[in-house]
Amino acid sequence: MKEKIKKLYSLQLREGGIADDVFHFLPEDEQDMLDEIKGRFFLRPEFRKRIKVVLTGGVFDILHIGHIHTLNEAKKHGDLLVVAVATDSHIEKKKRKTIHSQEYRAAMVEFLKPVDVALLGKAKPKDLLEFVGPDVIVYGYDQEPFIKPEGVEVIKLSKQVEGEKFKTSKIIEELGV
């Protein structure tokens, strides 16, 4: 049952609701877990409550062992790991540059073993939280918990890989990019 719920919630997150043409191909027992809202289908709350959704995020411009470690640790805190990948516009606002586009970075993260869903961040953190509805938010060792919603467990990882700090900016500097 839990695997079916995870599958349906993942579909819902990737597409902003499950489209009618996808809904009709789902087995009847899975269709019964969904409610129609404005022409799209969403997991009913009584089923959503049966899984623990973990949200984490980052830029993920040059993937390295520190990212993998953080994602593996985040996954341990729930059933479904959702990773918000920072948008290009968000990064530009912080006066930073990326090597890879937001779409490329999201696709790379989506293929990592611990990740169930990778999606682009939203302009406002509140909108992302409303969209994902996490039970847990995990921040990496080098991230400051900037949002702590009521009723959501917030975890800050302190563990680093082999005591070393892996930073994309240091890797870029070493590569001379």
Where are these regions (language model features)?
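Nucleotidyltransferase catalytic core that binds NTPs
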Residues: 1-177
